[in-house]
Amino acid sequence: MNFNFNKYPILSFANSVENLRLLSVEQLPQLCFELREYLLDVVSISKGHFASGLGVVEITVALHYVYNTPFDNLLWDTGHQAYPHKILTGRGEKINSIRKKNGLHSFPCREESEYDSLSVGHSSTSISAGLGMSIAAEKEGRNRKTICIIGDGAMTAGMAFEAINHAGEIQSNLLVILNDNQMSISRNVGALNKHLKILRSVQNTQKNRKKIRLLNKKLFFKDKRIQNHSISFNSIFSNLGCKYLGPFDGHNIFSIINTLKKIKNKKGTYLLHLVTKKGKGYLPAELNPIKWHTISSRDSSVSKSLSYSDVFGTWLCEIAAFDKKLIAITPAMCEGSGMVKFSRLFPNQYFDVAIAEQHAVTFAAGLAISGYKPVVSIYSTFFQRAYDQLIHDIALQKLSVLFAVDRAGIVGNDGQTHQGVFDLAYLRCIPGIVIMTPSNENECRQMLYTGYMHNKGPSVVRYPKGYGVGALLMPMNRIPIGKSLIKRRGKKIAILNFGILLHNAYCAAEKLDATLVDMRFVKPLDKSMILKLSSQNKFFITLEEGVISGGAGSAVNEFIMVNKIFLPVLNIGLPDTFIPQGTQEEIRHVYKLDSEGIYKQIFYWLRQ
């Protein structure tokens, strides 16, 4: 999509940071207006992360105007807000390809541009990486600046505070910009959110500084290093050793530039608190930033099936209605996980712990020890952030906690940072854990119930993003642990399917006249079924939507080797690589996990 010069005259000129710096300060408000309009035009067509970028237009322009990027490092935490950054760094005409196959990455990516100092996608990493870059620059004697832009939602994660704690001690030359829009994807929660609210209230007093100082000289003091007399006081960040500045209006381009220029060459760790509006410039997004966080593609026909997240949310409400011991936990993913209705109906049984996966898991451990029945809803890609807690605090103590692992397998457009393809490999080695892989919505429902009723340790139900196949939801019944189902009987070939590729596998099995088994459980495996099938077939095929290395197929391989079962096995899944962006259908086609691809992989393997 090319810039329309008549509509975007200044943006057309400022299509690189070199040209941006040729503009006068007086031209920057118009640039911000055009940049925001361009975002509205492009993202509404191309789809993608919408509201976050609208909120940081002025911050983005100011940073590239004042700092010498790409020599100076800009680190965008999480990356939802980086679309304006991409546009100003030479990628504006490709922005309509974002999140598409072979298009621009959803988030900053070092392989994509020298202006992307850090590849991101998960939250709360910027300050740690930025501190490392700052130390490296000091050791090299290079006057390179490092600036981290982090949202108040991402600031709730423990890793961000670990980095602030370190930075405040060593006083490296680092600027942290806190983009405070009171949101992550959902509305922010927790004591930090309340603290920032108190800090934001200072904005309303800055017009009356003299009066306030007379009333309470101890509350505020004049920072002589900043000529505009910004207010500094006892914030949590100053207590951790940062030079805290703000809060300031994050949409006042002149104020931001003046402040950045004055602290640009100062020594030590600064935290600049800027208050912004998520969705700024587009009223529907300002009023409902949760809905407009991302614009998703819409199919021409509305699916009549439930999404797996909806299945989970409905199941959760049904259980909570008769079991007051159920406690549902989410790390800041209420909407995406299908928990909105539950949070409203059962507020006393619901905890949003913010972006704190480690805390979420050990919090669940404490509840389980105390006789409650925790259900932790977590995305597959974020579950890996709490791996030690799962092992040390849950599995080692044999605590009965159910993990509803959403977005498992191929997720799609958010790309390599968000694909949920590693969970089976990193979960399978944990002693005593039960891992279930539903093949449709009803199986998901029954497995959730089975895992909830399991009282001998942790259990996991991993299910995909998106809609199911339209399976009828049946009354809840426990599934026998470790038992599979034969879905089709054939000859010579046995396909052992784990999870949602069952329908695709069935099409391939029909062509090959193969036996098809819905294995259901990755751990414990249905060993009796494998032994039985090994005596009736000449070839085994395992199928999963996850990495082959260490996954469900590897579990089958290990079992047949230990039991001296000598027959060829083909493991079908995802290769040893990071899976790029694209639609789920496109990615399955590329990696031959659609029905035709599965058939061809088996067919050509048999011919070898």
UniProtKB/Swiss-Prot annotation:
Reactions it catalyzes: D-glyceraldehyde 3-phosphate + pyruvate + H(+) = 1-deoxy-D-xylulose 5-phosphate + CO2
Enzyme class of the recorded protein, top EC level: transferase
GO cellular component: cytosol
Binding positions (Mg(2+)): D152, N181
Highest taxon in the source lineage: Bacteria
Cofactor note text: Binds 1 Mg(2+) ion per subunit.
Cited InterPro entries: Dxylulose-5-P_synthase, THDP-binding, Transketo_C/PFOR_II, Transketolase-like_Pyr-bd, Transketolase_BS, Transketolase_C
Residues noted as binding thiamine diphosphate in the record, renumbered to the chain: H80, G121, H122, S123, G153, A154, N181, Y282, E357
SMART domains documented for this protein: Transket_pyr
Oligomer and partners: Homodimer.
Family the entry assigns: Belongs to the transketolase family. DXPS subfamily.
PANTHER family (alphabetical): 1-D-DEOXYXYLULOSE 5-PHOSPHATE SYNTHASE-RELATED, 1-DEOXY-D-XYLULOSE-5-PHOSPHATE SYNTHASE, CHLOROPLASTIC
Protein name per the record: 1-deoxy-D-xylulose-5-phosphate synthase
Organism: Buchnera aphidicola subsp. Acyrthosiphon pisum (strain Tuc7)
Name of the gene encoding the protein in the UniProt record: dxs
